[in-house]
Amino acid sequence: MKKKGLKKTFFVIASLVMGFTLYGYTPVSADAASVKGYYHTQGNKIVDESGKEAAFNGLNWFGLETPNYTLHGLWSRSMDDMLDQVKKEGYNLIRLPYSNQLFDSSSRPDSIDYHKNPDLVGLNPIQIMDKLIEKAGQRGIQIILDRHRPGSGGQSELWYTSQYPESRWISDWKMLADRYKNNPTVIGADLHNEPHGQASWGTGNASTDWRLAAQRAGNAILSVNPNWLILVEGVDHNVQGNNSQYWWGGNLTGVANYPVVLDVPNRVVYSPHDYGPGVSSQPWFNDPAFPSNLPAIWDQTWGYISKQNIAPVLVGEFGGRNVDLSCPEGKWQNALVHYIGANNLYFTYWSLNPNSGDTGGLLLDDWTTWNRPKQDMLGRIMKPVVSVAQQAEAAAE
């Protein structure tokens, strides 16, 4: 099925020099002000160490996966200013895309205004990731790392390429798990963004079966850091016994018969991606019953996982430019927001950035003004966030 094409249209300088030497690093510990504690799953819930359900309001902030090797927007504003705004708007979870090429010794950060970001001067890309995690933790914002692509040039169908083989994919994940294992600001790993094409589920083919690969990588990560959540996206079709087409990363029908099973229990979170007609036309958008037909499609494709109490569902990407109920994209977005809220699912909205070509962002093109119509829509499913200071005060009472 024709997916969304180049959904994430970036305005970057394409400098694609490949290398394989990782930057040296020192494991980064949690700042005293960071959010404390890790999470695990309990049926379809994500809960903390005391069994209290997590209250996440999430978004994506991309850039580290691109040839800029840094977060987008730092050419306009400071990292501190942007994180302050994210927190002010009620978000406490960032899905942070990266590429394996980020860690190559030849990769250098580009397009940063160092007058606005003097503390980033001289830092290499992974140190910029460190800085984002440090600053997010100081604000009570937690991080899910997202292996978005192998090389910075574009998406890949499978979790590996000739230049970035499976061994590199896993070794980088283990490196990150070790680097942040003492820092509960980082709570999870989204193993690979949007498997599609050749990627299969339940076929048993070691070179294409994404479920088996997710188990290999998930177990490798948990052998280093058993506290992380492991987020597993779907495929687009090619599911054993069911070749129905869906969005890249969105088809999780295979979980019913072929679930991901890890050595450490209660760590798997399934994370579909879902988009609207502003990204690509799909048959269900042309159904006369649209948008009333959508909940049944979501139930069948990925929503059943939560409804049947198999595991939590975190919708890792969804977004679009228009939220007006007078247009198809607005009808789709509002219907999905209602579905997420009605079924108590988790989400990370795509995206903070305005420079995602066919979805836009929560920021407008000036990189400063918040998109109020989108925020008003998402506000219906955003949960009250208790700050670290408030938690400490409550514990002292």
Curated annotation (Swiss-Prot):
EC supergroup of this enzyme: hydrolase
Transmembrane segments: none
One Pfam short name: Cellulase
InterPro entries in the cross-refs: Glyco_hydro_5 (IPR001547), Glyco_hydro_5_CS (IPR018087), Glycoside_hydrolase_SF (IPR017853)
UniProt keyword list: Carbohydrate metabolism, Cellulose degradation, Glycosidase, Hydrolase, Polysaccharide degradation
Catalysis: reaction(s): Endohydrolysis of (1->4)-beta-D-glucosidic linkages in cellulose, lichenin and cereal beta-D-glucans
EC number(s) on file: 3.2.1.4
The organism's place on the tree of life at top rank: Bacteria
GO molecular function: cellulase activity
GO biological-process terms attached to the record: cellulose catabolic process
Active site: 194 (proton donor), 317 (nucleophile)
Keyword Kinase: no
PROSITE patterns to which the protein is assigned, alphabetical: GLYCOSYL_HYDROL_F5
Family membership: Belongs to the glycosyl hydrolase 5 (cellulase A) family.
Protein name in the entry: Endoglucanase
UniProt organism field: Paenibacillus polymyxa
